[in-house]
Amino acid sequence: MSDIKSSTLELVGKTPIVNASRYAAKAGVTDATILVKLEAFNPAGSVKDRIAKAMIDDAEAKGALKAGSVIIEPTSGNTGIGLASVAAARGYRIIIVMPETMSVERRQLMKAYGAELVLTEGAKGMKGAIAKADELAKEIPNSFIPGQFVNPANPEVHKKTTGPEIWEDLDGKVDILVAGVGTGGTLSGVGGYLKSQNPNVKVVAVEPAGSPVLSKGTAGAHKIQGIGAGFVPDVLDTRVYDEIITVENQDAFATGRKIGHQEGVLVGISSG
């Protein structure tokens, strides 16, 4: 029987979970099982495909997006890639605004999907990109900013999909969730769902040591792309996490490489 999808967007979600047993063994972890959810299996390669599709679906349902609309989004990278993919599949023009410090590879991926890029001063971080996106939205008719940092559809899609997927795949045997905080949508949605199933689940938020906004209230420069926006996002539910840990740039780089070498899985800096 044929199984042909009408769009790549039907492939978003339902990603597999693997046991990082070799990494755990080499790290000396003997009292825990480390599991990794492979969000790279999404069509555009990251967990951000989920929120990209969710925010566009939500906007279309509410009439905020229609034929001829222009999508504008400030992003540090993967959300832009996800949105560029969704925009291409739905036929929208899209402009991505991002700090100039983000990797060239991410820029090339967005352009490959047909996105237009506007780069902002790196020192101004995501705040600078957000301000520029707002400026462009005022200048361009029929424009729409999904606003991943403030859009409730962001954590909601994780509450409806990512969280339940983890719970079901593990038969409810979840003790600890560890997630980096960029917008905070993944941690808030997944963590909130898991705690609704079992209040004893511990949720750990990860942020860059160079920009410990959640743990110390101070923002700064760092090299862990994808997390550490430099402010507390509106969609982050600070009641969900039980602990905050900070990670140094070099530790994130090194761990990401170790996972590739030891598990055969290529992950980004924020996963490291």
Predicted regions and their residues:
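PLP-dependent amino-acid enzyme catalytic core
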Residues: 1-272
